[in-house]
Amino acid sequence: MSQAELNGELFTLERFPPNAEEEALQAWEAADEYLLQQVNDVDGLTLIFNDGFGALACALAERNPVSINDSFISELATRHNLRMNGIDEESVRFQDSLSPLPAAPALVLIKVPKQLALLEQQLRALREVVTPETRIIAAAKARDVHNSTLALFEKILGTTTTSLAWKKARLIHCVFTAPELADAPQTYSWKLDGTPWTIHNHANVFARSGLDIGARFFLQHLPSDLEGEIADLGCGNGVIGLQALAQNPNARVMFTDESHMAVASSRLNVERNLPDDIARCEFMVNNSLSGIEPDRFTAILCNPPFHQQHAITDHIAWQMFNDARRSLKYGGELYVVGNRHLDYFRKLKRAFGNCTTIATNNKFVILKATKVRKQR
């Protein structure tokens, strides 16, 4: 938790989910301050993209902005920080990056995302609604503003310039001039080796151009012939859950992720590759397994992320492991794949009281932990 002076006001801001071990990490950055210095002379509809923890939304709540984000956790963080500062949550309208944008905004503020493909998707969506009078300003750490970033703005929207660096942050100013632009596919797609399946990925999905090596290893060691419910936790494009659906014909599969684009990709991949099995599926945008009833799943399959935005962290994995233990039936099993150096074995042993190594190679390990009743 930290205090930030933004737009002439003092705000208390916190990263989300709150985590005592990461109190030193701020929920705002110089790029937020730099952006806010540019907006006081612009009135009208305001769109905010990729506001990680809601610093911009809190500072601009009086404008009733629209906050556009692929991350459900970022929405939860923004709502949390609005409440902490006594601001009505209804003052900000939330929508995901796949929903149509409001027309003719006066002001567009963009925090440049880590994934260039997501930025391209968002700029293409903006191209359909902005006007030459729309003030378009993006911001990032100076080290994250590359020639390729500027070229994308120039190609999709029009005339693009950059600011001087300030507190190691830089601004991108863009004027819409409607340059000629070829159409782009809505998703990236590739063939999954050893199957008849074509995998489709929206822009912000990890490994959108091919199967990542951790998932490839995990696919070789998934459980078969289970009954009940299986969860693909942190499903990404859903390739793990898709294989689980095929290998467990008497089970239901939940695909869940905090990314709207990930869950949309998972749904699309079931619809395109196993359409007859869609009735056995559930798709949920969620913060891990929050709100899921206890003792529900027979098995949970998980490849935990170890980044939150630009920060390296293990609290997401911890949350997933603890949520999995609560949500599994007694005797239910959590299967995890991860880089060897992350030491998930010790974490699972602590959370579950047991852990077994299923398989290992020179980079990854696959582990299994079982929910058992505590001995009295």
UniProtKB/Swiss-Prot annotation:
CDD domains per record: AdoMet_MTases
Superkingdom of the organism of origin: Bacteria
Reaction catalyzed: guanosine(1835) in 23S rRNA + S-adenosyl-L-methionine = N(2)-methylguanosine(1835) in 23S rRNA + S-adenosyl-L-homocysteine + H(+)
SUPFAM superfamilies on file: S-adenosyl-L-methionine-dependent methyltransferases
Disulfide bonds: none
One Pfam family from the record: MTS
InterPro entries reported in the protein's UniProt record: DNA_methylase_N6_adenine_CS, rRNA_m2G-MeTrfase_RlmG, RsmC/RlmG, SAM-dependent_MTases_sf, Small_mtfrase_dom
GO CC terms in record: cytoplasm
S-adenosyl-L-methionine in keyword set: yes
Enzyme Commission number(s) from the entry: 2.1.1.174
Compartments, as annotated in UniProt: Cytoplasm
Residues annotated as transmembrane: none
Keyword vocabulary terms for this entry: Cytoplasm, Methyltransferase, rRNA processing, S-adenosyl-L-methionine, Transferase
GO molecular function: 23S rRNA (guanine(1835)-N(2))-methyltransferase activity; nucleic acid binding
Function according to Swiss-Prot or TrEMBL: Specifically methylates the guanine in position 1835 (m2G1835) of 23S rRNA.
Entry's family note: Belongs to the methyltransferase superfamily. RlmG family.
Protein name (record): Ribosomal RNA large subunit methyltransferase G
Originating species: Klebsiella pneumoniae subsp. pneumoniae (strain ATCC 700721 / MGH 78578)
Name of the coding gene: rlmG
